């Protein structure tokens, strides 16, 4: 399935919802669980900052547990030309319409995940992955290629099964990988 996404800020979890999110069945809380093999999410703008998929929760900041924006299930996930960000501890700046920006929820950095991926052969091209602690960009895929992507995070953030080709990596901590014995490479 191909999903084309027009420039805008799309909240996967309502940032104005004051309810504290809790996980189910022993898992962390998720913004959206997606079960769809060969899902392609494609931003309709070459600048990934102009198509934003966002959340605004983290551990103890709107959630009990490490809030994760997406939980993808299926082989062949592809994301392209967009930003996937958990803006719990990072300001969201949207260049096309400033009023869609949002100040970070809290300056105290907490676990705020972007996405888990249960499957194989995942691919990201020209995507900005933004969060801080435990960013987890498509974490869990058996194999994933990040091509020309941008990563912003602190510790325990990069997936151990990813290959990062021509990516820019901005680390604000000392240990970007949570695990590195699974075949990942930069």
Q: Residue ranges of each PLM-predicted region?
A:
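Sequence-level preference for short, compositionally simple segments enriched
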Residues: 1-186
């Amino acid at each position: 399935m191909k999903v084309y996404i027009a420039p805008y800020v799309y909240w996967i979890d309502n940032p104005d919802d004051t309810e504290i999110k809790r996980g189910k069945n022993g898992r962390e809380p998720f913004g959206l669980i997606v079960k769809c093999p060969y899902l392609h999410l494609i931003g309709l703008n070459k600048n990934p900052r102009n198509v934003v998929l966002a959340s605004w929760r983290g551990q103890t900041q709107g959630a009990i547990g490490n809030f994760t924006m997406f939980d993808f299930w299926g082989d062949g996930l592809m994301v392209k030309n967009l930003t996937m960000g958990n803006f719990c501890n990072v300001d969201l700046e949207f260049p096309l319409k400033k009023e869609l920006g949002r100040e970070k929820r809290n300056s105290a950095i907490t676990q705020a995940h972007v996405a888990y991926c249960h499957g194989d052969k995942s691919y990201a091209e020209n995507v900005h992955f933004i969060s801080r602690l435990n960013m987890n960009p498509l974490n869990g895929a058996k194999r994933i290629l990040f091509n020309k992507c941008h990563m912003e995070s602190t510790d325990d953030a990069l997936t151990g099964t990813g290959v990062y080709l021509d990516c820019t990596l901005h680390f604000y901590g000392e240990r970007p990988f949570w695990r590195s014995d699974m075949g990942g490479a930069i």
